[in-house]
Swiss-Prot record:
GO terms for molecular function: 8-amino-7-oxononanoate synthase activity; pyridoxal phosphate binding. GO terms for biological process: biotin biosynthetic process. This is 8-amino-7-oxononanoate synthase. Pyridoxal 5'-phosphate binds at residues 107-108, 178, 206, 233. PANTHER family: 8-AMINO-7-OXONONANOATE SYNTHASE, CLASS II AMINOTRANSFERASE/8-AMINO-7-OXONONANOATE SYNTHASE. Homodimer. Disulfide bonds: none annotated. Its EC number is 2.3.1.47. It comes from Chromobacterium violaceum (strain ATCC 12472 / DSM 30191 / JCM 1249 / CCUG 213 / NBRC 12614 / NCIMB 9131 / NCTC 9757 / MK). The modification N6-(pyridoxal phosphate)lysine is found at residue 236. Substrate binds at residues 20, 132, 349. It comes from the Bacteria. Belongs to the class-II pyridoxal-phosphate-dependent aminotransferase family. BioF subfamily. CDD domains: KBL_like.
Length: 383
């Protein structure tokens, strides 16, 4: 893309209803937010347990800054790895029942790290068609043979695995799919990984803190295997920022030595790491929050049942697929006029003709807020 092509390119995106603009939040995250000077009820964040503004987390972060300062100042392999980082990794590993864990600045960085460190030229990686962009980018950057199987189609995956002669194989999936909210069949995927001597890499960005009593999708299914690599983010249900990878000790040691997005970057602020313990305690004690979330999910599914918008999601992500980009943008604008913030999601984030509004539920929402939103969203279909 040349300099002279930028403005016309942006104009083309605008004409196709695909120009992205940032909204400026002027309040803490929550069910009610202030954006560009106006108050809205938000169904747009991934703050599933409502912890992003929890007093205990805010206090832990402040205390961490008082103890460790504002920045880490170096990469983990120089002088950026503090006791706060070490204790956070130990706590995270114990929480999800693995030998070791490694902190990353983001889930994107973690996904690139794991995939590019374990497979390369001559190897093969097998990815679900609906995987997050960061998983796809990791697969592409690895230079391994990148094969995509139909969404949650175990027979198709097994065929690809059986036909592959690659010495190292890696299966990469989202545990909860970010745009549809449905879940990967993890037990069956692990069985295939065992059968074909493959790694199973699970991105549980949207399951950690919510599923399996908060310990995530692998815990929900009682899965334990050294070939299962578990990644979760700390910026969604956990209320903080960053991510971690958990697995057997040799795996984590390998990543410390080979993962470029771990080695060649400054460590995340130690104050964030210092707050991880408080986050895990809130998650462990968050049974009532998860029950409230289940009630909201049930209500949403009940309201959408029998409409063209009913889906397969039993998680906090409830997609409302409208098809065209223009219709999605128009509906989002209508909701904003009524005081609801539910942004339109358009290609390439979702497939062509799959534009949607993604209803993201939080334990902080009231049933009345959800009902009022759905009344507005379903009105065109009911009229």
């Amino acid at each position: 893309m040349r300099l002279q092509d930028l403005s016309p390119g942006l104009g083309e995106l605008d004409e196709r209803h695909r120009l992205r603009r940032r909204a400026t939040l002027e309040s803490p995250q929550g069910d009610e937010v202030v954006i560009d000077g106006r108050s809205y009820i938000s169904f747009a964040s991934n703050d599933y347990l409502g912890l992003a503004d929890h007093p205990s987390l805010v206090r832990a972060l402040q205390q961490g800054a008082d103890r460790w300062g504002a920045g880490s100042g170096a990469s983990h392999l120089l002088t950026g790895h503090t006791l706060a980082h070490q204790q956070a990794e130990e706590a995270l590993a114990g929480f999800v029942g693995r030998e070791a864990a490694l902190l990353f600045g983001s889930g994107y960085a973690a996904n690139l790290a794991v995939i590019t460190s374990l497979v390369g030229r001559g190897d093969a990686v097998f990815a679900d068609k609906l995987n997050h962009a960061s998983l796809n980018d990791g697969c592409l950057l690895s230079r391994a043979d990148f094969q995509r199987f139909r969404h949650n189609d175990l027979a198709h995956l097994e065929q690809l695995l059986a036909d592959s002669g690659a010495p190292t194989k890696l299966i990469a999936v989202d545990a909860v799919y970010s745009m549809d909210g449905d879940q990967a069949p993890l037990p069956a995927l692990l069985a295939l990984a065992e059968r074909y001597d493959a790694w199973l890499y699970v991105d549980d960005a949207h399951g950690f803190g919510v599923l399996g009593d908060g310990r995530g999708s692998a815990a929900l299914h009682g899965l334990a295997s050294d070939r299962l690599i578990y990644m979760a983010t700390l910026g969604k249900a956990a209320g903080l920022a960053g991510a971690f990878v958990a697995g057997c000790r040799p795996l984590v040691d390998w990543l410390v030595n080979k993962a470029r997005t771990y080695i060649y970057t400054t460590a995340q602020p130690p104050a964030l790491a210092a707050a991880v313990g408080a986050s895990l305690r809130l998650i462990a004690e968050g049974g009532e929050r998860r029950e409230r979330l289940r009630q909201l999910i049930s209500r949403c599914r009940q309201r959408l049942e029998g409409t063209p918008y009913a889906g397969a999601s039993a998680t906090a992500i409830q997609p409302f697929v409208v098809g065209s980009d223009e219709n999605a943008v128009r509906l989002a604008e209508t909701l904003r006029e009524q005081g609801y913030w539910v942004p339109a999601v358009r290609p390439p984030t979702v497939p062509e003709n799959g534009a949607r509004l993604r209803i993201s539920l939080s334990a902080r929402h009231e049933l009345s807020q959800l009902d009022a939103l759905l009344d507005l969203m379903l009105r065109p279909a009911e009229s």
